[in-house]
From Swiss-Prot:
Inhibits voltage-gated potassium channel rKv1.1/KCNA1 (IC(50)=780-2110 nM), rKv1.2/KCNA2 (IC(50)=0.19 nM), hKv1.3/KCNA3 (IC(50)=67 nM), and rKv1.6/KCNA6 (IC(50)=8.9 uM). Its activity (tested on Kv1.2) is not voltage-dependent. This is Potassium channel toxin alpha-KTx 1.16. Disulfide bonds join 28-49, 34-54, 38-56. Gene3D superfamilies: Knottin, scorpion toxin-like (3.30.30.10). The record marks 57 as: Aromatic residue of the functional dyad. Pfam families: Toxin_2. Belongs to the short scorpion toxin superfamily. Potassium channel inhibitor family. Alpha-KTx 01 subfamily. It is found in: Secreted. Has the structural arrangement of an alpha-helix connected to antiparallel beta-sheets by disulfide bonds (CS-alpha/beta). It comes from Mesobuthus eupeus (Lesser Asian scorpion). The record marks 48 as: Basic residue of the functional dyad. InterPro entries: Scorpion_toxin-like_sf, Scorpion_toxinS_K_inh.
Length: 58
């Protein structure tokens, strides 16, 4: 029972925040290229390059 609870808790914690990501149309080849883009658009440099486009996390 404890293991089931811990697995469920871990799943919930890992899934938090994925829906908050904001996609942009800015092309990138590395995560460092997205930091100034995210800072300019959303006020925070939290982002990464995914599938050739910047994805920002508020």
């Amino acid at each position: 029972m404890k293991i089931s609870f811990l697995l469920l808790l871990a799943l919930v914690i890992c899934s938090i925040g994925w829906s908050e990501a904001q996609f942009t149309d800015v092309k990138c080849t590395g995560t460092k290229q997205c930091w100034p883009v995210c800072k300019k658009m959303f006020g925070r440099p939290n982002g990464k390059c995914m599938n050739g486009k910047c994805r920002c996390y508020p």
